[in-house]
From Swiss-Prot:
Any one Pfam family match given in the protein's UniProt record, by short name: HHH_5
GO CC terms: cytoplasm; Holliday junction helicase complex; Holliday junction resolvase complex
Positions of region (Domain III): 153-205
Protein name listed in UniProt: Holliday junction branch migration complex subunit RuvA
Biological role: The RuvA-RuvB-RuvC complex processes Holliday junction (HJ) DNA during genetic recombination and DNA repair, while the RuvA-RuvB complex plays an important role in the rescue of blocked DNA replication forks via replication fork reversal (RFR). RuvA specifically binds to HJ cruciform DNA, conferring on it an open structure. The RuvB hexamer acts as an ATP-dependent pump, pulling dsDNA into and through the RuvAB complex. HJ branch migration allows RuvC to scan DNA until it finds its consensus sequence, where it cleaves and resolves the cruciform DNA.
Record region (Domain II): 65-143
GO molecular function: ATP binding; four-way junction DNA binding; four-way junction helicase activity
InterPro entries (alphabetical): DNA_helicase_Holl-junc_RuvA_I (IPR013849), NA-bd_OB-fold (IPR012340), RuvA (IPR000085), RuvA_2-like (IPR010994), RuvA_C (IPR011114), RuvA_C_sf (IPR036267)
Organism: Parvibaculum lavamentivorans (strain DS-1 / DSM 13023 / NCIMB 13966)
Length: 205
């Protein structure tokens, strides 16, 4: 199995790139985001590779980051999501944006991807909620802070608030989404108690 390619961009197409590695050209299927991030022909590139083997062919799927590849694998585990749809989602949403959409139950953001209707978007959000690593989901959900301004890191009160809600019996994904929503309503100095209180209000809606 091929896990990584390091070489030169030979050529690109609508959904593929040919990477020259030591004189051998590898045809790699890519999302639109990956293609946008590739250097021009002749430029050096390293791609994380997911190898798909079928009776007809061996297919290489390329990603500019390991995170994108991991998300691709998660998406393929969702009922009704194949390679084309998964790449469509990753072409529309960066890993952090996808994690945020799932943590905040934002089906509309997911359905913006080509080939993803409301039902598939709902399945993606529902089936992946508990599969997103805790730190990834919380960090992504809180990345956009008050008034939409980015924050550099997740505060200790936010982490404590999520832990408290989980201890109260709420699922991890719901707790993260509630605290993220509460954090957007409060200022950066919000205490754990404030985040818990407002988080509970979000969960009661």
């Amino acid at each position: 199995m091929i896990g990584k390619l390091r070489g030169i961009v030979d050529s690109t197409g609508e959904d593929w790139a040919v990477i020259d590695v030591g004189g051998v050209g590898y045809h790699v299927t890519c999302s639109s985001r990956t293609l946008r991030n590739l250097p021009p022909a002749g430029g050096a590139v390293t791609l994380s590779i997911e190898t798909k083997v079928s009776d007809e062919a061996i297919r290489l799927i390329g990603f500019t980051t390991d995170s994108e590849r991991e998300w691709f694998r998660l998406l393929l585990a969702v009922q009704g999501v194949g390679t084309r749809v998964a790449l469509g989602v990753l072409g529309t949403l960066a890993p952090a944006d996808l994690a945020r959409a799932i943590a905040l139950d934002d089906k509309k953001a997911v359905s913006a991807a080509p080939g993803v209707g409301p039902k598939v978007a709902a399945r993606i959000v529902t089936e992946l909620k508990d599969k997103v690593p805790d730190s990834m989901g919380l960090s992504a959900a809180l990345e956009v802070g008050v008034n939409g301004e980015a924050v550099s890191s997740v505060s200790a009160p936010a982490r404590d608030a999520v832990s408290a809600l989980v201890n109260l019996g709420y699922p991890q994904a719901q707790a993260m989404g509630a605290v993220a929503a509460a954090a957007k309503r409060l200022d950066d100095a919000a205490s754990t108690e404030q985040l818990i209180r407002h988080g509970l209000k979000e969960l009661a809606r």
